[in-house]
């Protein structure tokens, strides 16, 4: 499991006093109000940044970091990820998972027949859909509903599914 979780990507600067526009990659933008620190992944190193101020503008979060007071000091980080530790992640309810924890799970039917690897989670609005890539390179789409997903075991890296008629040709 990953230790650092991406909560946003710096999309551009905002003004000339070192603020940045951040595209949030979290379901709840308001979580930025509770964060005190983030880790900036520059690609070469990871820097701890203290959040001084949080504002919202349309679909963006505007962040001001302590000690960065000039557009020139932050401009070079455009397109870079902002990360938090797993300890600072939101608490999940029963049956909820972080998508990145699901990627790579081995999918199998209830009888133990191997189907392949979970490679992607599509967020459709109604329910998520798991994309399982078979050894033959085909994709099986499994809706994340109780009728289809019987068990998710992160420790064993296993996903047990029930294939209802019509899911696989």
Curated annotation (Swiss-Prot):
Entry text on domains: The PRC barrel domain binds ribosomal protein uS19.
SUPFAM superfamilies xrefs: PRC-barrel domain (SSF50346), Translation proteins (SSF50447)
Organism name: Lachnoclostridium phytofermentans (strain ATCC 700394 / DSM 18823 / ISDg) (Clostridium phytofermentans)
GO BP annotation list: ribosomal small subunit biogenesis; rRNA processing
Keywords associated with the record: Chaperone, Cytoplasm, Ribosome biogenesis, rRNA processing
Protein name: Ribosome maturation factor RimM
Stored InterPro entries: PRC_barrel-like_sf, PRC_RimM, RimM, RimM_N, RimM_N_sf, Transl_B-barrel_sf
Role of this protein: An accessory protein needed during the final step in the assembly of 30S ribosomal subunit, possibly for assembly of the head region. Essential for efficient processing of 16S rRNA. May be needed both before and after RbfA during the maturation of 16S rRNA. It has affinity for free ribosomal 30S subunits but not for 70S ribosomes.
Top-rank taxon, per record: Bacteria
Location in the cell: Cytoplasm
Record's GO cellular component terms: cytoplasm; ribosome
Domain PRC barrel: 94-167
PANTHER family given in the database record: RIBOSOME MATURATION FACTOR RIMM
Quaternary structure and interacting proteins, as annotated: Binds ribosomal protein uS19.
GO molecular function per UniProt: ribosome binding
The UniProt record lists the keyword rRNA processing: yes
Gene expressing this chain: rimM
Family from the record: Belongs to the RimM family.
Pfam families: PRC_RimM, RimM
Classification of source organism: Bacteria, Bacillati, Bacillota, Clostridia, Lachnospirales
Keyword Chaperone: yes
Gene3D superfamilies linked to this entry: PRC-barrel domain, RimM
């Amino acid at each position: 499991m990953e230790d650092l979780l991406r909560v946003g990507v710096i999309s551009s600067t905002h003004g000339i006093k070192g603020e940045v526009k951040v595209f949030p990659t979290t379901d709840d933008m308001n979580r930025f109000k509770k964060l005190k620190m983030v880790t900036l992944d520059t690609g070469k190193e990871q820097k701890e940044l203290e959040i001084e101020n949080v504002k919202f503008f349309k679909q963006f979060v505007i962040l001001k970091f302590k000690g960065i007071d000039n557009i020139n000091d932050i401009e070079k980080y455009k397109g870079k990820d902002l990360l938090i530790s797993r300890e600072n992640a939101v608490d999940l309810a029963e049956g909820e998972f972080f998508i990145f924890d699901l990627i790579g799970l081995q999918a199998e039917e209830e009888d133990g027949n191997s189907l392949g690897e979970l490679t992607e989670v599509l967020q459709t609005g109604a329910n998520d859909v798991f994309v399982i890539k078979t050894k033959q390179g085909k994709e099986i789409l499994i809706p994340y509903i109780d009728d289809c997903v019987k068990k998710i075991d992160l420790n064993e890296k296993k996903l047990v599914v029930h294939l209802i008629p019509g899911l696989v040709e």
